Amino acid sequence: GMLIAATDSQAVTLEWALSCVLNHPEVFKRARDELETHVGQDRLLEDSDLSKLPYLKNIIYETLRLYTPAPLLLPHSSSEECIIGGFKVPRDTIVLINAWSIHRDPKVWSEATSFKPERFEKEGELDKLIAFGLGRRACPGGGLAMRALCLSLGLLIQCFEWKRVGDKEIDMREESGFTLSRLIPLKAMCKARPVINRLEK
C-alpha cells in the first residue's frame, strides 16, 4: 500500500513540476543549462549526476512547497496534553498538519505564492519545507522520492523540447482531495532532442 501511495504522489508531483517549468521558461532554461553543463547530450542523466544539479533539486523542492502531494500530513496523536498555537490539546487527540497552508504562509515564506526555485539557495529555507514531515516521524521514503523526482524531471528536460499547447499559461488550479492533483490534467507538446537519436543507434 505504501509503495502505491508513493508512486501516485510522485506522478502527481512530476505533473505539477513540469507544469511549473512550462509556465516559467527562465526556470526551464536554467535547469536545461545546468544539465548541459554537467551531463551534456552524449549520455543520459544518471543518479550519480544529481549531486551536481542543485537547481534541478530546487525545482522539485519548490514544487513540493506549492503543491504538496498530501496537503494534510499524516495524522498524529498527542501523547500528552499540550498547547499548539495557543490552543489546549488534550492527550490522545488526533492532530493534522496543514502543510499546504504552512507552505503558502507569507509569514513563513517571502513571495509565498510565487514559483521561485532559487529561494532554496538561501540558508535555512529548506528547513521550513515539511512536504515529507519532520523529525522522527518524517516520511521514510522522502530521500528516495526526491531522487526519483529529480531523475524523472531531469530526463524529461534533457531528452525533450517542451512547449505549451497554445500561448496561454497552463491552468494551475488544484483539485481538492487526499492528494493534491491538478484540476485539469497537463497537456503539453514534446519533441525528442538529439540525445534520444544517439541512444537509438
Residue ranges and their predicted role:
Residues 4, 45-54, 83-87, 121, ...:
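Conserved, non-catalytic sequence blocks in retroelement Pol enzymes and Pol-derived host proteins
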Residues 9-27, 32-34, 142-159:
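Cytochrome P450 catalytic-core helices
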Residues 25, 44-86, 106, 113:
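Conserved cytochrome P450 K-helix E-x-x-R motif and the immediately C-terminal K′/meander segment
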Residues 31, 63, 89-92, 115, ...:
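Hydrophobic, well-ordered secondary-structure elements that form the walls
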Residues 36-38, 124, 132, 136-138, ...:
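Cytochrome P450 proximal C-terminal region
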Residues 37-41, 65, 69-73, 121, ...:
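Conserved helix-loop functional segments at active or binding sites
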Residues 67, 79, 97-123:
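Conserved cytochrome P450 K-helix/beta-meander segment immediately N-terminal to the heme-binding cysteine loop
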Residues 85, 92, 97-98, 191:
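Generic beta-strand/beta-sheet core signal
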